[in-house]
Amino acid sequence: MKKVIKVLLSSIFCLSTLAGCSSSPYTKAEAQTLTIQGVPVYVEPDEETTQEDIDTFLKAIKAQPEFLKKNCTGIHLQGENAFINYAQQNFGDKYNKTFGYTIGEDVFLKTNLNVNGSKRDIDSVKDTVAHELWHVFDYANGNDEYYLSEFDFNILYNQNPGSISEYGATNVLEFFAEAGTMYLLSPEELKEKNMDVYNYFESLPKE
């Protein structure tokens, strides 16, 4: 069976005008279920989650291409306490400090925007949402035993594992997600770092 992957994620900026929200950005978020381009999005706040937090993540999700979202069966936007409690139930304490992870084709994100005294911006959140969705893509396009990245792409990883990022060098799954995110958000940078990897992502089906 495939291994469960758990990965990093983050948050950002207010979507109030786009979402039709006229209330204060500090208004507490309420639990609800939304659909974005066919993907169920479950808002699971705690007492500290603001509507600004949620609107930021919704904006980042909407910005992702449809081909990357089509295999995703659900995105859970969780307040920090809800995120930690769920992670502990499933994985113990190991993932308490992460900002997100995936289980199969579901994505779980911690919606806390403030990290170590600073606030994450929209670009940071788009980056991490894309990273998680590439893990879903990797999982969904593999088979019962292996992720997609564990086939031909594994050769590219082994040739130069540190070419994309320090985190990407961890293993082929992270290399794939980091490279895919760069392909979407900074394609020229990916070309400079590893043209063969860029060409691989260029050849992937995107329908």
Identify the residue ranges that each predicted region occupies.
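Catalytic Zn2+-binding segment of zinc metalloproteases
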Residues: E132-S149
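Active-site scaffold of zinc-dependent metalloenzymes
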Residues: N81-T128, V136-A140
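Soluble non-cytosolic domains of exported or imported proteins
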Residues: E47-D55, K119-T128, T170-N171, K191
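Bacterial N-terminal signal peptides
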Residues: S10-T17
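Positively charged n-region of N-terminal signal peptides that target proteins for export
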Residues: M1-K6
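Sec-dependent signal peptide cleavage junction
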Residues: T17-A31
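Metalloprotease/metallohydrolase-associated module, dominated by Zn2+-dependent proteases
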Residues: E150-E207
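Auxiliary, metal-adjacent structural segments of Zn-dependent hydrolase domains
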Residues: Q37-E105
